[in-house]
Regions:
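ATP-binding/phosphotransfer module of carbohydrate and carboxylate kinases, centering on a glycine-rich
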Residues: 1-65, 84-90, 108-115, 158-311
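Short glycine/serine/threonine-biased micro-segments
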Residues: 6, 10-11, 69, 118, ...
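Short, conserved beta-strand segments within well-ordered enzyme catalytic domains
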Residues: 67-71, 96
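Short loop or secondary-structure boundary microenvironments that flank
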Residues: 72-76, 250-253
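Phosphate-binding/catalytic loop of phosphoryl-transfer enzymes
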Residues: 75-171, 305-311
Length: 311
């Protein structure tokens, strides 16, 4: 059988992680290009960036592409428009572009029913049931980003502000803030507003470090955020009608294992929490293979990750 070639790419707000690979999992080319959340940069600009990543993979290589699969943050609001765009530029391939939850699920359990919970700057629970796909929570930081790094950081800043006002008692988070940034929060306001959501999310460490030292305010924030995240899991439990597998992904879960431990203690025992050990773009590869009628076994994953990590 002639060799077959596939493209998978994962798009976030910061970067696009794209791979060209073969049917047996060998990565031929791996590129990192600028991110392209269509809500951030606009739909036309975003599509141009997706195409740039695909062209960077194909440059100088005259190989036919069997399938193209792209996972893109916030693409669910644009229906099939991005897929239709890409089909025009890779007409020989089966093309599917969709939101980024499915690839996280597939990276760990293959193309089957399940869910993933992302907890980084933002948060949400994405689910897949047959052909149905959607999310619970994750309506953006202006509406709902429960338990996320941004919410943790924002609540920490509010606790510090309340302590400085005298509305609440002192909190260790004030001291930790000054140690990290070299000035009080009151003197740091310009930088906070300039940095915006990602900068505030980076301050989530205040909650975890202060909580470990027994700080009451930090403990309260931690518990509130765990309650919000567990609500997402319980809502998923009702949607699935019982047990399901939940893949955990995102920087907050990765850096703060106590957050995962606390979540485990507050969700239904029938829900299996699975720590992700593969990058989202591997899930894109699994989905591209699925569109060609192939499943990905252990050898495929081993070869793919070996090539990916080497890059």
């Amino acid at each position: 059988m002639d060799q077959e070639y596939f493209i998978g790419f994962d798009v976030g707000g910061t970067k696009t992680d794209a791979v060209l690979f073969t049917r047996d999992g060998e990565i031929i080319r791996h590129v990192i290009t600028p991110g392209a959340n269509p809500l951030d940069v606009g739909f036309e600009e975003a599509c141009g960036r997706y195409l740039h990543a695909v062209n960077a993979l194909r440059e100088g290589l005259n190989v036919p592409i069997r399938c193209v699969y792209g996972a893109v943050a916030c693409l669910e609001y644009f229906k099939t428009r991005a897929t239709d765009f890409m089909k025009q530029h890779v007409p020989e391939a089966v093309v599917r572009l969709e939101s980024d939850g499915n690839c996280l699920i597939s990276a760990m359990i293959g193309h089957q029913d399940g869910a993933c919970m992302i907890c980084g700057t933002g948060s949400s629970l994405c689910f897949r049931q047959g052909e149905a796909y959607g999310h619970i929570g994750g309506w953006g930081y202006l509406v709902d980003s429960c338990g996320s790094g941004f919410v943790l950081g924002k609540k920490a800043l509010l606790a510090i502000a309340r302590a400085e006002d005298g509305r609440d008692g002192p909190t260790l988070m004030s001291k930790l803030f000054e140690e990290r940034y070299g000035e009080s929060m009151n003197s740091h306001y310009e930088k906070i507003y300039q940095g915006g959501r990602p900068y505030i999310a980076s301050m989530a460490f205040l909650v975890f470090e202060a909580r470990r030292a027994g700080d009451r305010a930090a403990g309260k924030i931690f518990d509130e955020c765990i309650a919000d995240l567990s609500e997402l899991v319980w809502t998923g439990y009702r949607r699935f009608g019982g047990a399901y597998q939940l893949i955990l992904n995102g920087g907050v879960f990765h850096h703060y294992p106590e957050y995962v431990q606390a979540l485990r203690a507050h969700v239904p025992p029938q829900v299996t929490l699975v720590d992700s050990d593969a990058p989202p773009v591997y899930g894109c590869a699994v989905e591209a293979m699925y569109d060609a009628g192939y499943s990905c076994g252990p050898e495929f994953k081993k070869k793919f990750l070996s090539g990916y990590n080497r890059d």
